A protein has these predicted regions:
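Conserved alpha-helical scaffold segments that buttress catalytic/binding sites
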Residues: 2-215
């Protein structure tokens, strides 16, 4: 069960023209040259997609990620960051990406999947294009003094002799999507996110489809 859709009064999606302008002008996407990708029901399915592409030799970690969302998906709310920082980081990096076990233990969901991807050392750079009307939800403990992401905990530091030091991930936040501009994507994915997006937002999936080749 994915839960009930939030009421329309909670969020008003951008209009079709704004969405298309963002895809073409800010992201450099083209209907004439669609990019491989996929549309999911929930955000965390991106992990399964990335893993499948890596196993097929089509995606090499670590890779850059551009995250366009109202939420950071870095575990601001429950269950928080502790499990990833204290349990996942103590494991051998090559043995961390056990998605089924995390889901079965109710540790992984769509509100924290990017934190897991960072802990898997899949991401080399993260750009977050957020809704300026949303609340800031980036856990401060994930950031270093320069504002980049540096995952660690007291217990994970003790394991650095075996696992190596966790990488520093360049992290950039765009509060105004018009200030963002980046092209050259290898893959484009989108989540319907019915727990967080009203039904009227589903039309954005239809707007995106001409720009991707579902794979």
């Amino acid at each position: 069960m994915l839960g009930e859709r939030p009421p329309e009064s909670c969020a008003r999606p951008y209009g079709d023209e704004q969405v298309i302008a963002f895809l073409e002008e800010q992201c450099g996407l083209s209907r004439a040259h669609p990019v491989p990708g996929r549309i999911f029901d929930t955000h965390d399915k991106a992990l399964d997609f990335w893993l499948a592409q890596m196993e097929a030799g089509k995606l090499q970690p670590p890779f850059d990620v551009v995250h366009v969302d109202t939420h950071s998906d870095l575990a601001f709310g429950p269950p928080g960051t502790d499990f990833v920082l204290k349990a996942v980081l103590t494991r051998n990096p090559r043995a961390r990406a056990t998605l089924g076990a995390y889901r079965e233990g109710k540790k992984l969901d769509e509100a924290n999947y990017l934190l897991f991807a960072l802990a898997f050392r899949w991401i080399s750079r993260l750009a977050y294009v957020r809704n300026p009307k949303s609340h800031q939800d980036i856990p401060a403990r994930l950031l270093d003094t320069e504002g980049n992401i540096r995952l660690q905990s007291d217990i994970s530091v003790l394991m650095e002799a075996m696992n190596g030091r966790e990488p520093t991930i360049p992290f950039e936040v765009f509060d105004d999507y018009r200030q963002f501009s980046e092209t050259g994507y290898d893959f484009v994915t989108m989540a319907q996110s019915p727990r967080y997006a009203p039904a009227s937002a589903d039309r954005i999936m239809r707007l995106l489809k001409p720009y991707i080749l579902e794979t």
